[in-house]
Amino acid sequence: MTPPSRTVLIVSDHTGLTAETTARALLAHFPSQSLKYLQRPFVASVEVARGVAREVAALAERGERPLIFTTITEPAVMRELEAAPARVFDLLGPGLIALEHEFGEKAARSVGRYHDMHDQTSYLARMDALDFALATDDGLGDRQYGLADVILVGVSRAGKTPTSLFLALQHSVRASNYPLAEDDFERESLPIPLEPHRAKLHGLTIDPRRLHAIRTQRKPGSRYASLEQCEYEVRQAERLFGRAGIPVRDTTSASVEEIAAGILAQLRRG
């Protein structure tokens, strides 16, 4: 049975980009879950936080238990969120407390502190790469592929999205990703949007049995999740990669960090 949809609220005292990226990176490890994301940025006062708490209460009345991912550092605002009928994930609090003990001083805990970093250029580059990855995720925005550093290609649920987001946030790499579908296999050639960008393509493959397990969690009993379909798609994708001369990385037992490291090494080799 497919699990019911869960609402994920991204709550921040600033833009929410940091909170959303971290939340998506964590939740990408649970592909069977059906999730709806709601962004609630600039929650910098108790009054605004109470409004978010009321929204959560309304969801709870319908039988849902929302998830809140937050980078709020103001204790009074945080208390309002923690009182709401939701599972709250404090993305900064535990780390700040540990650092306070380590350094022997209190954290500044000012609104948007992360965005006042000395290395503003690096931060802006990562946020730009993140915006690009989200805008060109899962085949979207293919007209922007000319601006990409790398385009990840593979069948559905091979690990393209979490790898793209990791490359963007950790390495400022503009990573797009494109899902291969049956129409592409029938053509026996690269999808038209990818043709002009062969040098940027990097294939991701996966063991069909592992793919079957992942898809079964998401859509049990469907043709999409059947082992036969998974074997067919992986086989056809690998043939396509071979014909096009695209470098390929197996994601079956690799972490996102390991996949990204291999792609970065390939990019450095040119």
From Swiss-Prot:
Highest taxon of source: Bacteria
Residues in coiled coil: none
InterPro entries the UniProt entry points to: Kinase-pyrophosphorylase, PSRP
Keyword Cytoplasm: no
Protein keywords: Kinase, Nucleotide-binding, Serine/threonine-protein kinase, Transferase
Pfam families xrefs: Kinase-PPPase (PF03618)
Catalytic activity: [pyruvate, water dikinase] + ADP = [pyruvate, water dikinase]-phosphate + AMP + H(+); [pyruvate, water dikinase]-phosphate + phosphate + H(+) = [pyruvate, water dikinase] + diphosphate
Enzyme Commission designation: 2.7.11.33, 2.7.4.28
Keyword Nucleotide-binding in record: yes
GO MF annotation: an example: phosphotransferase activity, phosphate group as acceptor
Positions annotated to bind ADP: G154, V155, S156, R157, A158, G159, K160, T161
Family: Belongs to the pyruvate, phosphate/water dikinase regulatory protein family. PSRP subfamily.
NCBIfam families: PRK05339.1
Functional description taken from the UniProt entry: Bifunctional serine/threonine kinase and phosphorylase involved in the regulation of the phosphoenolpyruvate synthase (PEPS) by catalyzing its phosphorylation/dephosphorylation.
Protein name: Putative phosphoenolpyruvate synthase regulatory protein
Source species of the chain: Deinococcus geothermalis (strain DSM 11300 / CIP 105573 / AG-3a)
